Amino acid sequence: MSPQTETKAGVGFKAGVKEYKLTYYTPEYETKDTDILAAFRVTPQPGVPPEERGAAVAAESSTGTWTTVWTDGLTSLDRYKGRCYHIEPVPGEEEQFIAYVAYPLDLFEEGSVTNMFTSIVGNVFGFKALRALRLEDLRIPVAYVKTFQGPPHGIQVERDKLNKYGRPLLGCTIKPKLGLSAKNYGRAVYECLRGGLDFTKDDENVNSQPFMRWRDRFLFCAEAIYKSQAETGEIKGHYLNATAGTCEEMIKRAVFARELGVPIVMHDYLTGGFTANTTLSHYCRDNGLLLHIHRAMHAVIDRQKNHGMHFRVLAKALRMSGGDHIHSGTVVGKLEGERDITLGFVDLLRDDYIEKDRSRGIYFTQDWVSLPGVLPVASRGIHVWHMPALTEIFGDDSVLQFGGGTLGHPWGNAPGAVANRVALEACVKARNEGRDLAVEGGEIIREACKWSP
């Protein structure tokens, strides 16, 4: 037991406020394979030493509080406390530094992303001694990874279910997102799927509104799926959004989707919450449904560069909680992202083992062992002229999701879908023949236009 937690007969309990760094700053600490490691970007209030602020983050996100309490003597803080074990400056930012914190695995409930985030980020972000705080990355130890089911099926099983290999999958979000009747909505789904897309999608805020109740939408979309499958000979799907006000209602919608025989449902995992998401993920694995994940509300959390959480942390959490697809940004299009950083967390979604690479924003080596991978979804503001870049950047294991880039075609929905499919097939064929998509992409698309709407 450490001197800070030890109580001795005859001495009595010594109350009072102590500097955090006396207990929680331990630069000599050697991290364990079972520790959860966190990298925080810290912007402290003026005049506060980095060691004290880094230790404060470790304390307030683990066992600490603002004062010494007598019940410290009833446990072992050395076993349970978080430790700030390293501090480094942020290049180009005089007032910021990266604090590395190690958390003992016993602080976390098995298989619960909810508990993990409640512990690590649930309270410390309101700490007034900090001007701003951002969680840049987490290292999830193998011992903790193995307590999660992860994605319901994963990349390979999805390809086997769809019988589609050797190319990215194509999707489309039905527009306008709100206001269509269920029958007209189903018609748009049918036209897009018949034209050559693999999937169509409910927008994130399509749940069960007065203009289109969920059950009606599910029925008309299922009819569209079966009709397009019969005409094309391909397996098709529509992301039926099961997100609801309660977990019970969400599962009821997923059950109805399964009874209709459709292949995939959808969830808004941040607004719906990690407990709901994990519940739905378990249901999907048990019942053969794929699970598409939308990240609605992510920018509230990850957009600020010095406060909140980076999306790579949310992506890791989703892989643990469970989802077969997740929107990941495009690098091109109207929501352009930093290419290397985006591909860094795309690899964290898909690959089994990812080495530390600070140039791509990856602070820790991550081993996912047997946890299935997640397909990244590139969407928003993309169209056929982006197809060469998207095919080159994201590779085969991805979903390319066109909304206005399909439905905005001057000839209608089905020709828009045909144009997307022809462009994709042309890019994949050219790539397989050894042509450089980055250099010849425009020419490849122009050649494809001769055979497409």
From Swiss-Prot:
It comes from Galium aparine. This is Ribulose bisphosphate carboxylase large chain. It is an enzyme of class 4 (lyase). Coiled coil: none annotated. Signal peptide: none annotated. GO terms for molecular function: magnesium ion binding; monooxygenase activity; ribulose-bisphosphate carboxylase activity. The modification N6,N6,N6-trimethyllysine is found at residue 14. The keyword Magnesium applies.
